[in-house]
């Protein structure tokens, strides 16, 4: 008994000595502290905001394009990552938002209003697609959404009187905004959408409902959740994010052709979401930047023949060493 008492006293004294040393030690970076994460977040935003002052026009264009793509990736994170609905037709919604802004702006409508119409039309199409698609599962759902993407591409290609088809829409008026302003606008929009998705995922009851539907629809239905309505809302909101991506793309590039919104682009968005980590908005944001800037940077350096090879190699390496994607790595650092 005396030995046990003495060991407890020794342990207590050692713990007190350690605490005294820590109190006298200089400030240490706490990786798991909320304050440290806030500092890192503020620093990252400040670095992104300062990029136009550091890099040239080409790289700023690449970052803006990557930010626009990230909105389409966010739409997949909401639909597939949170709700568990596999979609290979997101490029169709992006094209709807883009061409709505392009056509209306060419007719003299204000670009902001035309972009809003593009988002609303994409949401309407997402709602209509969700009516039958919300009842499908697995590969049936994947094929159904892929069919929607192909149908949208064919409509954009063959509606020559409206979209000019393969000739493309040229000279879309956007008010003459300079690149630095575009960059800051895109960065602000992406951060707002990213913050909204992170809030839904981690803090809101809607995120809990979406995850319940993803994990077990029968249990969610037994809990009183209208699974069909939840899926329909997910389709609609996801289409709105994709439509916003398309509207901003049209306003920035000012040139549209249907080939920019074919099924290959849908697979590209899905690949970015997978590399970023399905269901991780932060990972999707990082993957969209990574998988846009590095291949395009190789093209700028004259290594265009190896661009797709490097792209595929990057994807395989990430999936091999990070099965949960970049988002999984971020989550491990948080814990």
Feature names for model-found ranges:
Residues 5, 27-29:
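Aromatic (phenylalanine/tyrosine) cluster motif
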Residues 12, 33-35:
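Residue-identity detector for glycine
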Residues 23-25:
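N-terminal regulatory/sensing modules of transcriptional regulators
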Residues 35-335:
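Transmembrane alpha-helices and adjacent helix-loop boundaries
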Residues 18-21:
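A charge-rich, low-complexity, intrinsically flexible signal that marks solvent-exposed coils, linkers
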């Amino acid at each position: 008994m005396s030995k046990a008492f003495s060991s407890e006293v020794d342990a207590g004294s050692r713990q007190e000595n350690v605490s005294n040393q820590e109190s006298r030690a200089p400030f240490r970076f706490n990786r798991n502290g909320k304050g440290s994460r806030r500092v890192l977040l503020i620093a990252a935003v400040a670095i992104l905001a300062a990029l136009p002052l550091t890099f040239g026009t080409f790289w700023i264009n690449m970052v803006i394009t990557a930010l626009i793509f990230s909105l389409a990736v966010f739409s997949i994170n909401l639909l597939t990552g949170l709700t568990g609905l596999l979609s290979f037709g997101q490029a169709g919604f992006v094209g709807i938002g883009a061409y709505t802004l392009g056509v209306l702006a060419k007719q003299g409508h204000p670009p902001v209003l035309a972009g809003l119409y593009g988002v609303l039309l994409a949401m309407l199409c997402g709602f209509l697609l969700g009516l039958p698609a919300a009842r499908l599962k697995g590969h049936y759902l994947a094929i159904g959404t892929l069919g929607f993407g192909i149908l949208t591409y064919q409509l954009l290609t063959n509606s020559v009187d409206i979209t000019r088809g393969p000739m493309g829409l040229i000279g879309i008026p956007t008010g003459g905004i300079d690149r630095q302003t575009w960059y800051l606008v895109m960065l602000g929009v992406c951060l707002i959408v990213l913050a909204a998705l992170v809030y839904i995922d981690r803090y809101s009851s809607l995120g809990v409902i979406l995850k319940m539907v993803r994990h077990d629809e029968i249990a969610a239905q037994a809990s009183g959740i209208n699974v069909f309505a939840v899926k329909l809302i997910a389709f609609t909101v996801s289409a709105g994010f994709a439509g916003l991506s398309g509207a901003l793309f049209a306003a920035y590039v000012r040139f549209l052709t249907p080939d920019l919104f074919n099924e290959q682009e849908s697979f590209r968005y899905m690949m970015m979401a997978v590399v970023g980590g399905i269901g991780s908005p932060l990972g999707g944001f990082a993957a969209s930047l990574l998988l846009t800037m590095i291949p395009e940077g190789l093209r700028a350096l004259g290594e265009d023949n190896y661009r797709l090879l490097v792209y595929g190699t990057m994807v395989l390496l990430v999936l091999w060493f990070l099965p949960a994607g970049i988002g999984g790595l971020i989550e491990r650092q948080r814990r």
